[in-house]
């Protein structure tokens, strides 16, 4: 499922733009049960969009900035990808 930039909650942290997410996710060749580790997850856009292609998979988002963690949680909840 493609997610547009404007659909994500954004902060001053950098966000991977939708065109870059689309190419990156396509190159990962994810399977429905893949496991993705997103190091330096920022606002969580790559992991959250990737999760839409992995219904039985898992995404682990790692981010050192507290504001980033809060934003990842908001975005994950918004797209029902938080467990």
Show the residue positions of the predicted features.
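Class I SAM-dependent transferase core
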Residues: 1-37, 71-74, 78
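A generic "cationic amphipathic patch" detector
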Residues: 37, 49-52, 63, 72
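Conserved S-adenosyl-L-methionine
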Residues: 40
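Conserved SAM-binding loop of SAM-dependent methyltransferases across substrates and taxa
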Residues: 43-55
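Short beta-strand element of Class I
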Residues: 56-60
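S-adenosyl-L-methionine
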Residues: 62-83
């Amino acid at each position: 499922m493609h997610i547009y930039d404007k659909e994500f909650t954004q902060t001053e942290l950098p966000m991977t733009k939708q065109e870059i997410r689309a190419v990156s996710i396509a190159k990962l060749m994810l399977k429905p049960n893949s496991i993705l580790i997103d190091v330096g997850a920022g606002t969580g856009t790559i992991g959250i969009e990737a999760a839409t292609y992995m219904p039985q998979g898992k995404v682990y988002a790692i981010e050192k900035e507290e504001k980033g963690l809060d934003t990842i949680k908001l975005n994950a909840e918004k797209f029902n990808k938080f467990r």
